[in-house]
Amino acid sequence: RVLYVNGEIYIEVAKHPQWPFYVKTNQMEVQVLGTSFGITAYDDEIFQTVVLKEGSVFVKNNQGNGQTIQPNQCLMVEKEEMTVKDVDVYDYISWIDGVLQFHEKSLQKVLNSLSRYYRVRFDCPMEIGQIKCSGNCKRLRDATIVLQTRVFSFVIKKR
């Protein structure tokens, strides 16, 4: 069983030793060992992440380096580099409950996420894009409603 991903997913997989389950992206392969986890792996982003809610997964990058992560850990892959840190898993998978949550993310990363969810484009000067943001918002059908509740002014262009 193999799943190829370009985007963001959350999966709950039952343990079946006779039928291994793998998730592959352009930078990594995740061997699932019976678990609940999230993956963020967009082809146009430098970093890809695996965050583990329950169970365990073994992550291998394209160079063959591998590491097992435990619940409440996030593994980031950037080409040959792999970094593990302890995290609040909900920061990474809150979108499955209809909540977009950000903790100490650059404004540019927040705008990139909003752009993907709402299919609109956000342009932001580089110096402003580096500002760190924290917060959350309920995912609504219309991006203008979300943006009207914020302090920033945006110009919205349909894709």
Give the label of every model feature segment.
Residues 1-159:
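A residue-level detector for the "anchor" residue at the start of short, highly conserved motifs
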